């Protein structure tokens, strides 16, 4: 089914921002993008999803292997004891983690990446060798891409689920621009423009679409 994702501002990357913009998705590919009126006129009968904020390409997470196997993502039932943030280093070493707990952590980590507008995970050789992680990633729908061009270092005091934590602008954080014929990997953020988005960070994510499928929405 043809679906149109529309937002007050479309930031395709590599092309000018489009006020009241839209992206038409046919299956898993982008069929059209531009001003909403033009996209809608070319796709009569399409389902329309209207989002607040900015519509962008999906983001790329450079440190997925670290975040998924060297960090523990607490279950909500553990928040009182462990907090909500990923645990690593000495805090991780203090936990007694069975494979069952690790499996739950990896699944939660992937869900939280989706909740940060992430659609692509960078990994050496564009694959995960850890079977537990590889299986969970395959089920998640997240795309695995090479680490070519990675900054190579974790910035800040701790691993961060926010791809913008590397300090890049939008163009340096997405996996690729929105283009007709490309995979429909999109993200929507509750921000007025790119400046506001990079200031607020990817936790402002409203929705994440991978290959045309809506895999996360916060509202």
Descriptions of predicted regions:
Residues 1-42, 162-199, 209-219:
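N-terminal metal-binding scaffold of metallo-dependent hydrolase/deaminase domains
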Residues 6-8, 52, 122-127, 190:
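Structural motif
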Residues 116-155:
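Active-site loop-helix segments enriched in His/Asp/Glu that coordinate
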Residues 93-115:
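Alpha-helix-centered segments that form part of catalytic cores
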Residues 76-82, 86-88, 96, 143-161:
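Long, charge-dense
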């Amino acid at each position: 089914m043809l679906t149109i994702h529309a937002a007050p501002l479309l930031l395709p990357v590599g092309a000018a921002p489009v006020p009241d913009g839209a992206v038409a998705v046919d299956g898993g590919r982008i069929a059209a993008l531009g001003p909403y009126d033009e996209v809608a006129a070319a796709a009569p009968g399409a389902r329309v999803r209207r989002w607040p904020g900015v519509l962008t390409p999906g983001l790329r997470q450079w440190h997925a292997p670290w975040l998924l196997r060297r960090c523990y993502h607490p279950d909500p039932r553990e928040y009182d004891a462990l907090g909500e943030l990923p645990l690593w280093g000495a805090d991780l070493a203090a936990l007694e983690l069975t494979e069952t707990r690790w499996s739950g952590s990896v699944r939660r980590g992937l869900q939280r990446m989706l909740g940060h507008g992430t659609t692509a995970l960078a990994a050496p050789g564009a694959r995960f060798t850890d079977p537990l992680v590889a299986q969970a990633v395959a089920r998640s729908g997240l795309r695995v891409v090479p680490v070519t061009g990675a900054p190579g270092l974790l910035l800040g005091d701790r691993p961060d689920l926010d791809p913008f934590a590397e300090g890049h602008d939008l163009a340096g954080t997405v996996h690729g621009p929105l283009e007709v014929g490309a995979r429909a990997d999109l993200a929507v953020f509750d921000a007025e423009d790119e400046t506001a988005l990079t200031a607020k960070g990817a936790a402002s994510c409203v929705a994440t679409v991978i290959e045309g499928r809506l895999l996360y929405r916060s509202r």
